[in-house]
A protein has these predicted regions:
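Catalytic phosphate/metal-binding cores of nucleic-acid and nucleotide-processing enzymes, i.e., regions
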Residues: 1
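Short acidic, S/G/P-rich loop/turn micro-motifs used as interaction or catalytic elements
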Residues: 7-11
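Conserved acetyl-CoA-binding loop-helix of GNAT-fold acetyltransferases
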Residues: 13-25, 194-208
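Structural alpha-beta junctions
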Residues: 25-32, 54-60
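Conserved GNAT acetyl-CoA-binding A-motif
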Residues: 27-41, 210-222
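Tryptophan-centric aromatic hotspots in well-structured domains and transmembrane helices
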Residues: 34, 95-97, 200, 204, ...
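A conserved beta-strand-loop-helix scaffold within acyl/acetyltransferase catalytic domains
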Residues: 39-195, 207-209, 225-226
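Conserved catalytic-core subdomain
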Residues: 220-232
């Protein structure tokens, strides 16, 4: 399985074939029987579909919700060449208000890079808040060790963020930055103090990181493709 792969020039058919031939050899050595990819390519790219079909892949592109491993539909913010002030000015008035409200109410934020020493208490706080979020919203949550290993593996390309109120962690996120994109990967919030809007401030801090890194896109990640008001 290659999440969001392949990582190469998808128009270079020779490179693509060499890449997948190599992947097939690895799969055979590991007794694999299936290769799955979730490429970051628009569904309207018919040439890519033809190229992948020629390589033996079958396109499954009819799902509207979260049937796959990676989301088919994402929400992205265009920040190419924009300053913080320009990006903030394009937010809805209520969004700007909530970002400022969090700071006004005394919410503070802190981040740790994956290539640095992340305090165990920070990882524990994030994992605990994730458990709270999972129970509230009814989804399975990864372990603390999983998040620690992921941050360590991604190194300087990942950050753990926590929001605090009166010294207590109340919200947390993990973001990753590669090339010209920054991804909001995980988010968690306490059942308490949600009225001080810590998530808005954390989102803004991650967007600021994306702007500082010269990114073109800030990706909020998965949303449903079914826009019906009746869709839960």
């Amino acid at each position: 399985y290659a999440p969001r792969g392949p990582v190469c020039d998808i128009r270079d058919t020779a490179v693509m074939r060499e890449l997948f031939d190599g992947a097939a050899q690895v799969a055979k050595q590991c007794r694999g029987y299936l290769m799955q990819i979730d490429p970051d390519v628009l569904n309207s790219d018919e040439q890519f579909k033809r190229d992948m079909s020629a390589l033996g892949f079958a396109c499954e592109g009819d799902s509207l919700n979260f049937e796959g491993i990676q989301p088919r539909f994402v929400f992205r913010l265009d920040i190419a060449g924009k300053t913080e002030d320009e990006v903030l000015a394009h937010f809805e008035q209520k969004t700007r208000y909530n970002v400022r409200l969090a700071a006004k109410k005394g919410v503070t934020t802190q981040f740790w890079s994956g290539d640095g020493d992340i305090p165990d208490e920070a990882l524990t706080a994030f994992a605990d808040i994730m458990q709270t979020t999972g129970k509230r919203d009814r989804f399975l949550v990864r372990s603390k060790d999983y998040f620690a290993n992921m941050l360590r593996a991604l190194g300087k390309h990942a950050r753990l963020y926590l929001a605090y109120l009166d010294g207590q962690p109340i919200s947390g996120t993990i973001a990753s930055q590669y090339g010209d994109k920054t991804w909001y990967m995980y988010g968690a919030s306490s059942n308490e103090h949600r009225n001080v809007m810590p998530n808005y401030l954390l989102q803004w801090e991650m967007i600021r990181w994306a702007i500082a890194g010269g990114c073109r896109i800030y990706d909020f990640r998965g949303v449903s493709g079914d826009l019906s008001p009746d869709n839960p």
